[in-house]
């Protein structure tokens, strides 16, 4: 994706997206206009220092030369090459360089209007590029294959493990998710799948039901006395669940191996014993083949995870039929969404509710989120962009603050005829902070963390011509959500669900306690 802006503070508005692209490995081309060199540091209006302004958050930054009226062929070729190099750098110029943003800063002198320039050479064959619509400079890269010695050592470690497990964090590759579910099946080992892993919602779920584990955020809170794993295979980014992170921290005796295509470090707890830089899907496929040649028997270890998973969802399903709360909103949305739909899940509480309350299901739902830096900037706009690259419908579930920060994203939907379903869980402020110890300290909590705003969003929807529904009960929400999905081909709908953060937290804690007590007896 390429984004363009004028000079000055407009360039700073791109920074949150650039940071997210940096940490999430998303290719992005940043094209900023700038004042000419003689006006920099001169007090000229709308002029700031834009040269390498994004620091290490971009893969490459170039202050492009001023345009010339009659450029030499060398200059033309350098610009054509620059475009190709920028595209390649954003997409990972080699397979060990993470994808991310590239910044090209273009200074211009007046006149800026599209007027004829004497002796302009835009019709020169040098501008035309290569024949057959090929890039001027084609840059290719291949996958990193693991060495034979690394795979032999991995096979040996895996073969001698008695209690192996797979962790798949946020991941955009459906191929990797499929390879790991196959490995978990033939290896009879639990696959703890993050809600953004692409492994929870798959058409293969029923045949993998006993291995794909999604209820861990609840039942691992009662697993302190469980036997620890002796091998943990870690794929993708760090998981969303704090309970799973705590479990990894407590697994002192486990040999932990992380896998990465580009060497990006995803271990804030500094626990991994080994990092293998290679194509993770190829490694998973090789391990599955190795296992199928020497099948593992089912074990008490894997059976306990499977039994805990089943019991957890029995308890959660029953709890969803009780008093309405915010976790039920996310669970019901996922259960109603059709096969092939896409979900963009907002940060803060929504992604955690998806993790804890939306059970795995036998349908392909691609889950997106901004988990690189986990900010709430540009939530509506990002979902709008994602919707243009996936099959309809796309559902956005966000909190009220995330929606409030990007309400003008609704204008993008209106202007470009983009139709999505937006669910806003409105707990009147930063409800996630209710989970933290600071919630016990008032007035600092209420004034500085909760930041109650007292707003509802029906008038916002009306201003932008978006259909609106308010849901105060589970029946109302399910009905409104089904109507919105059926109408997504013609217009967008905003569904607002008011909730009470204190009551929501009490419901969550009660459900977790029920799960903990139930799995203790397994």
Regions found by a protein language model. Name each.
Residues 1-35, 227-236, 391-405, 420-425:
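A short, small-residue-rich loop immediately preceding and capping a beta-strand
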């Amino acid at each position: 994706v390429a984004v363009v802006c004028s000079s000055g503070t407009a360039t700073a508005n791109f920074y949150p997206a650039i940071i997210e692209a940096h940490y999430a490995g998303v290719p992005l081309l940043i094209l900023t206009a700038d004042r000419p060199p003689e006006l920099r540091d001169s007090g000229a209006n709308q002029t700031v220092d834009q040269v390498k302004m994004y620091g290490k958050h971009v893969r490459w930054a170039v202050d492009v030369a001023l345009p010339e009226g009659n450029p030499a062929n060398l200059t033309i070729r350098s610009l054509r090459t620059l475009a190709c190099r920028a595209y390649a750098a954003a997409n990972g110029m080699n397979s060990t360089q993470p994808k991310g943003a590239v910044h090209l800063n273009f200074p211009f002198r007046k006149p800026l209007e599209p007027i004829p320039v004497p002796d302009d050479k835009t019709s020169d064959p040098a501008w035309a590029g290569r024949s057959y619509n090929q890039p001027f400079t084609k840059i290719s890269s291949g996958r990193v294959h693991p060495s034979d010695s690394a795979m032999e050592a991995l096979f040996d470690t895996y073969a001698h493990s008695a209690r192996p497990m797979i962790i798949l964090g946020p991941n955009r590759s459906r191929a990797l998710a499929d390879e790991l579910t196959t490995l978990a099946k033939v290896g009879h080992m639990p696959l703890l799948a993050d809600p953004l892993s692409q492994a929870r919602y798959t058409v293969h779920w029923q045949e993998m039901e006993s291995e794909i584990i999604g209820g861990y955020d609840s039942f691992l809170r009662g697993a302190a006395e469980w036997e620890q794993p002796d091998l943990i295979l870690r794929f993708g980014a760090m998981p969303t669940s704090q309970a799973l992170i705590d479990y990894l921290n407590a697994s002192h005796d486990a040999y932990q191996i992380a896998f990465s295509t580009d060497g990006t470090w995803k271990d804030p707890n500094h626990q991994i014993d080994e990092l293998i830089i290679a194509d993770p899907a190829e490694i998973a496929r090789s391990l599955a083949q190795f296992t199928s040649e020497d099948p593992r028997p089912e074990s008490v270890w894997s059976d306990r995870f499977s039994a805990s998973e089943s019991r957890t969802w029995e308890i959660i399903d029953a709890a969803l039929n009780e008093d309405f709360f915010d976790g039920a909103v996310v669970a019901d949305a996922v259960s109603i969404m059709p096969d092939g739909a896409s979900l963009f899940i907002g940060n803060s509480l929504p992604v955690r509710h998806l993790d804890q309350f939306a059970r795995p299901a036998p349908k392909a739902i691609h889950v997106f989120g901004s988990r690189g830096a986990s900010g709430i900037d540009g939530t509506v706009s990002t979902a709008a962009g994602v919707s243009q690259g996936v099959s309809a419908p796309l559902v956005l579930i966000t909190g009220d603050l995330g929606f409030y920060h990007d309400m003008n994203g609704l204008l993008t939907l209106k202007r470009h005829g983009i139709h999505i379903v937006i669910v806003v869980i409105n707990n009147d402020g930063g409800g996630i902070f209710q989970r933290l110890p600071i919630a016990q300290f008032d007035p600092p909590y209420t004034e500085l963390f909760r930041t109650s705003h007292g707003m509802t969003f029906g008038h916002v929807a009306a201003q932008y011509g978006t259909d609106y529904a308010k849901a105060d009960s589970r029946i109302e929400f399910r009905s409104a959500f089904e109507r919105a999905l059926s109408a997504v081909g013609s217009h967008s709908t905003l569904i607002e669900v008011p909730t009470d953060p204190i009551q929501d937290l009490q419901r969550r804690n009660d459900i977790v306690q029920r799960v903990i007590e139930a799995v203790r007896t397994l």
